[in-house]
Amino acid sequence: MRFTLKKIFFVFLTLLIISIGYLLLQSVDLQRIRELLHDSEKFDLESLKQASLEIRKEIHYTNYLFSGYDNFTQQFSDEETLKQTSLNDKCKLVFTQWKESHPDFEFKTFEPEYERYDKSSDRKELFFKERINQLRKRFEKDSNNKNKQFTLSRQDNKTISQEYMEHVNRSKNVLQFMADFVSMMRLYGKCFFGRELDDELKSIYNEFRGKLFPFISSQAPKFRKSGETEEFGWPIYDNENNIIDRKTEFGDNPIEFLQKNSKGKGIVISVSTRYAKDAMRLIKILRALNNRLPIQIIYKNDITKKNIELLEFAAVATPEELFDPETIRDGAKFMPELNLLEHYKNYGSEFPIQDLTFVNIAGCVSRPYRFSFPGYSNKILAMLYSSFEEIILFDADVVPTVNPQEFFDSKYYKSSGTYFFQDRSLRDFNDFIETNFFSTLFPSNEKSIETIFDIPRVGEKTFNNKYMTGWRHYQEAGVVAYNKMQHFLGILMMFPLALWSEPVQSSIWGDKEMYWLGLSMAGDENYEFNKYAAASVGEKTTEQKYKYYPNSDSNEVCSTHPGHIDDNGRLLWINSGFSYCKKNGYFRDKGKFPFSTFELNDLVELYNSPIKIRAGLVPPDLPNQREPGSPPDTKPEMEFRKSWKSRKKDTDEINEKLPEGQEPYDFISEWGPQKGWVKNGICSGYYYCAYDKITSYSSEKEFDTGTLFEFDTKSCELYDYLSKIWHTGGSKMKPKVKLETEKLGTGSDKEQXKDATTVRLRI
């Protein structure tokens, strides 16, 4: 057979076309067929839940490894060589490597929504539900689909699944960055804090200060003593606690400056004009309790001149001036039988002049972050920028009922350099994704960069606390006693928590959990909480006709005020001032039980009077909702929450979804309380009733029990006295004064009082 050139050409062309067609089939049709053959993804609810479980296992904190771990360990031939290497050499290596491998490393806030950690990353079924609802709404909105039924195609499911995995991968990357960032902070503390540094380490120390803490500027706060006009810089002390210099700038490394130049003990209050009235009341309460600790008011150019004058007046005026009928006429109606001017000495009050300093930190935050610290986060700035080494941080609206020195003298503070207080044990729960997130920020894994650098790992104390075992509320931060130098890294750890928008902001309530979280993130578990959780303080309900569970033998204390009681049954402080209800007047609540049974005049008098503290009730603690260690399998906690539905309903639940025509329940006679804290609509929802005997969550016993504290007559008289002080303490009247400067010596904190000059204001 002869092959002509023409035939050869056609054969070649045919083979080429077949080859191209085959390749196209391979890349398109066969690829599509291959995809279909391998497309086994299921989208039923159980399959989605199983996929969620696999994701939770994948993102579990035990799988976290510092990004620089392998690069670092590869520089050592064996484990023994690594152990023999000095801390200085390890520090130089780890920071140099990190700089080389991450040249653009800097703090990130993750503020834009498209950058954020997605808390639905472990809930594929929830993600699908939300996206399907969006598709359905879009379908129904389209006028062309009026008579059509919404259906979800397999391709729709696949698109949602792909989008879900994009969110998961983004969240993984964000979590890795955040955990790496916190690891770098721990290494920074280990390598540089409290150590003698050579020039190379000093250079690294200063360089990474800017990378880790770019929000801290080099400008020092401006200090001004009460009654003076001159502002001065940060006080520098010698070894005998004499002030030898003032600094208006922190120098090359503000972190080093702040750590080395904080001295003395004192009270710190973050105040703006919004909270100035509460702060005036607090200062007068402190004087009634004979406080002799110096006070620093931390602000950011956000207190008016008038309010500054009123705060100064509260701090230095004589009792005659404080309780002058013209000054306190708004508060004179409260307990008229108690004449403060005649009786204050009967309560042991000396009303010492307060050593008050205003600390303006407006310039201390770098310009790009000036508006990144609103509200509660100002308290974290106040901790850092107070010049005290040991602080009691007060919210402006708290009321201490003991001399503040007692917080420093407590066994908890003496043993740990901290004294924290527990919140109410409300039955509000958190989710796996939240506790697992925070666990990833803790040093907890054996295979870790922290182990190599001998940084302590956290254990049962952290993982077994109330928050980490599934409950939303653990710490109440109205009062925090804190030794800054002993726990300096813990303060710094709070800043990324305050600046990262998600998942932090939706996982904790303001700053409340940040104090113990910051310490655990630092690998520092040397912190202590008060023995008892928060109590409901007020009057025990004694008349059956006013009780929400009239046939129960559980004690009941209803109040808008949580209080905090020490091991010996003494009330230490309360939240939210002394008003019976500061959110609204009686008018909104007059139709709500038990006030619906009151005579109107009696209700008006109740709302216009301070709360009477006669008892404090601490409800029983809750069992773990989640086992320690954030187990990826959430079925046990879901089953536990499901079991609540089989319990009888409390007054905050029983009126939900009532059958049409059925009268709502004011109270429940047939059974007793099921929860220790039952929320009420009174006072805009700030009113809670506490119970010390509830149906047990355990099948092994009938009841869980708490503790009722009934205060003695002397204590109750003191609380009434303090309530009168508080109600007369927030006058907005601008006093007519002349200034007389005099030397102030408190006698208790020598280092704070040596150069202290104050003023006495005369009406």
Swiss-Prot record:
Keywords, in A-Z order: Glycoprotein, Glycosyltransferase, Golgi apparatus, Membrane, Signal-anchor, Transferase, Transmembrane, Transmembrane helix
Residue ranges, compositional bias (Basic and acidic residues): 649-659
EC number, UniProt record: 2.4.1.-
Spans within the Lumenal topological domain: 29-763
Glycosylation sites: 71, 157, 169
Name of one Pfam family that matches: Mannosyl_trans3
Protein's name according to its UniProt entry: Putative alpha-1,3-mannosyltransferase MNN15
Organism whose genome encodes this protein: Candida albicans (strain SC5314 / ATCC MYA-2876) (Yeast)
